[in-house]
């Protein structure tokens, strides 16, 4: 009887790690959703990029994620800015955003993920504002995991790097 209880508990925990309420903190480093299936191989049918190729330290830049065709929509994301393996900066997400919310991946608001909305409609394009660290410098790459549907997702889709420059 105890074995059945343990199996049920483990199954429930595994299932709850793949909620539609956003990526769990456990996905912050590897950016792999707990969906029990392998990611799709690159190239992904999505693009990610900043609207500028540089940003001043302490300032902001918009980052846009888009499907390449109208059929390339998103139900979920996990978005981060990285220098190497380090997550840097913070994000702005409007409180009334119907798709995303902030996630704390080791620091407040340093990642963006989807949120639960009843009858959520897939998005073809989303954009969020990234705030460069005030003491930042060097190249930053934006990485996003995109979920088209539960068993169809791409991990760490990468932008071209942008440079953080010191404000004078």
Curated annotation (Swiss-Prot):
Its main location: secreted. One of its GO terms (cellular component) is extracellular region. GO terms for biological process: defense response to bacterium; defense response to protozoan; innate immune response. It is found in: Secreted. Transmembrane segments: none annotated. Keywords: Antibiotic, Antimicrobial, Disulfide bond, Immunity, Innate immunity, Secreted, Signal. Residues 19-168 form the Reelin domain. Pfam families: Reeler. Belongs to the insect defense protein family. This is Putative defense protein 1.
């Amino acid at each position: 009887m105890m074995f059945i209880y343990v199996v049920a508990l483990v199954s429930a925990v595994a299932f709850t790690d793949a909620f539609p309420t956003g990526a769990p903190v456990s996905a912050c480093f590897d950016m792999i959703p707990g969906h029990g299936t392998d990611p799709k191989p690159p190239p992904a049918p999505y693009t990610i990029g900043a609207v500028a190729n540089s940003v001043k330290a302490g300032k902001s830049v918009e980052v846009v994620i888009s499907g390449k065709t109208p059929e390339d929509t998103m139900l979920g994301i996990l978005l981060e800015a990285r220098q190497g393996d380090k997550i840097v900066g913070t994000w702005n997400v409007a409180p009334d955003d119907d798709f995303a919310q902030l996630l704390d991946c080791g620091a407040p608001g340093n990642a963006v993920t989807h949120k639960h909305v009843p009858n959520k409609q897939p998005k073809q394009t989303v954009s969020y504002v990234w705030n460069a660290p005030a003491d930042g410098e060097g190249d930053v790459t934006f990485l996003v995991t995109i979920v088209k549907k539960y068993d169809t997702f791409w991990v760490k889709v990468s932008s071209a790097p942008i440079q953080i420059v010191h404000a004078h």
